[in-house]
């Protein structure tokens, strides 16, 4: 023990840094966690610029480091590429953001590594452990809030029709139907382009409809804030002329004026829960069914972007 302490002290004095390649060869573990970002672009921009993605990456990197691991980012939804990189570096486990259940099925045939999915809609809990958000309840809370403020024709705006978008619309639709008797998808759901310049052209065409409805529920804070920017250019006042809400409660929601009413999801809790589950999987623990598909609770955050309808 005394000799080991002397060697350690000498290594500290000379600033010795161990070679990771040699360590990988000499051990069965790499102490590397792969973070798969399942998309290269969001809203027509680099996905890492999205406030939700960047916040999650920051939170999960802290969790990985605190657990004594290193983080390797792997981008895209190419299952073969992910399997190749993971095997080459002997990655201990994967956290995968934004993949579909189908992609996880494909990866599982190629790779047997502990994996935790983030925000995947999973029909088979044995396929992959998932940590998601209670999207339905969050949008339901928003729908009730809109109804309580007297808005009968609130429009719901999204960029695609993936499972998450469908689930959020379903929650919104349930609340509006309970309040007013109906909420037809073909009348309320508007599909926007992911490209900003095209979205601006859509807004030009939709502006009369926006004014008539007086209320817009966006699928994300990003789209809501982007719309505020457009409205400012057009002389439209928020919330006096058109009220809006977002979803996610990213830090930008408090920076804009008016401050954005939105749904808060605890991204830090999502990251810590995912890492705790992954560590248990790495340690070969079998998780009970109720811990294989966790939904993080959400909360409506009321700020300044919605007025009471007279």
Report each predicted region and the residues it spans.
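N-terminal helix-turn-helix DNA-binding module of bacterial transcription factors
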Residues: 1-31, 307
């Amino acid at each position: 023990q005394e000799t080991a302490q002397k060697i350690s002290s000498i290594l500290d004095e000379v600033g010795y840094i161990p070679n990771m390649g040699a360590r990988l060869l000499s051990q069965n573990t790499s102490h590397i966690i792969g973070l798969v970002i399942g998309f290269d672009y969001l809203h027509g921009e680099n996905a890492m610029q999205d406030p939700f993605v960047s916040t999650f990456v920051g939170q999960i990197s802290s969790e990985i480091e605190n657990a004594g691991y290193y983080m390797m980012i792997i981008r895209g939804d190419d299952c073969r590429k992910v399997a190749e990189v993971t095997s080459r570096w002997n990655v201990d486990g994967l956290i995968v953001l934004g993949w579909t259940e189908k992609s996880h099925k494909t990866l599982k045939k190629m790779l047997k590594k502990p994996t935790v999915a983030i925000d995947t809609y999973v029909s088979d809990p044995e396929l992959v452990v998932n940590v998601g958000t209670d999207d339905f309840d969050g949008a339901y809370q928003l729908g009730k809030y809109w109804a309580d403020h007297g808005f009968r024709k609130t429009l719901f705006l999204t960029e695609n029709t993936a499972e998450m978008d469908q689930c959020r619309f379903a929650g919104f639709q349930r609340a509006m139907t309970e309040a007013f008797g109906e909420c037809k998808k073909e009348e309320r759901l508007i599909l926007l382009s992911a490209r900003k310049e095209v979205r601006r052209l859509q807004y030009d065409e939709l502006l009369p409809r926006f004014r008539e409805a007086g209320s817009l529920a966006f699928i994300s804070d990003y789209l809501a804030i982007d719309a505020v920017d457009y409205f400012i250019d057009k002389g439209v006042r928020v919330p006096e002329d058109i009220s809006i809400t977002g979803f996610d409660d990213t830090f930008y929601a408090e920076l804009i004026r008016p401050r954005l009413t939105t749904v808060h999801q605890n991204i830090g809790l999502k990251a810590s829960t995912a890492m705790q589950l992954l560590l248990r999987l790495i340690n070969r623990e079998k998780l009970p069914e109720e811990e294989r598909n966790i939904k993080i609770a959400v909360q409506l955050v009321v700020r300044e972007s919605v007025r009471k309808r007279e």
